[in-house]
A protein has these predicted regions:
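Glycine-rich, N-terminal phosphate-binding loop and its surrounding beta-alpha-beta segment
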Residues: 58-116
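Extended accessory regions or peripheral subdomains of proteins
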Residues: 1-31, 36-75, 112-195
Length: 195
């Protein structure tokens, strides 16, 4: 059952809780970790972990693909308006809580080239990496690690105990050590770099 404000349960404290849980989720599509970096700074208070979105939006150029359950739709409408419509349908509208900075909703990537949908920009940059202009997941749950209060909060707009069981059932996925697949090489000449 969906709730207006999320149900919250507290998990045992561990400073590395974000990495601990994310290591079990990182293999899932749309899993994300926003990490504070453990810095002693007011803006480094929280780590946020999400995965398993209820909906995703991906924009390349003029097309946005919205994927919800088994349904995929493509639109050329303004991607930010499409995102707002999807958020409205998800009906995730929690009240402000300074101890829970993210209580579900949209999390993702807004690339510089998304600006081309709203204003004319010069076409001087080389597209040297293939990334969407926008890639956003809509999440109805999150894990929030608060490094000031030393709390780990699992919140969900649906059954929080079912989400906890799901989270705890995720298995660690061993990762291979990083290795180069080819020699290092520059993407520009020394002269180009100096310009």
């Amino acid at each position: 059952m969906k709730t207006l404000s999320p149900a919250v349960i507290t998990l045992p404290w561990r400073q590395d809780a974000a990495e601990f849980y994310f290591s079990r989720l990182s293999h899932l599509p749309w899993a994300m970790l926003l990490h504070s970096g453990y810095a002693d700074h007011p803006y480094s208070r929280f780590d946020i972990v999400v995965a398993d979105p209820i909906c995703t939006l991906t924009t390349f150029g003029k097309e946005t693909v919205v994927s919800e359950s088994e349904k995929r739709t493509t639109t050329t409408d303004d991607p930010l308006q499409v995102l707002q419509q999807v958020l409205d349908r998800a009906d995730i509208r929690p009240t402000h809580n300074e101890d829970l900075p993210f209580q579900g909703g949209a999390l993702g990537l807004f690339g510089y080239d998304l600006g081309r949908r709203f204003e004319s920009l010069p076409e001087i940059a080389e597209q040297d990496i293939v990334l969407p202009d926008m890639a956003v997941g809509i999440y109805d749950w999150a894990l929030i690690v608060d490094h000031q209060r030393h709390t780990v909060s699992l919140l969900s707009h649906n059954d929080v105990n079912a989400r906890r069981a799901w989270l705890e059932s995720q298995q660690f996925s061993p990762q291979e050590d990083f290795t180069l697949t080819s020699d290092w090489q520059s993407n520009m000449t020394r002269e180009q770099y100096g310009e």
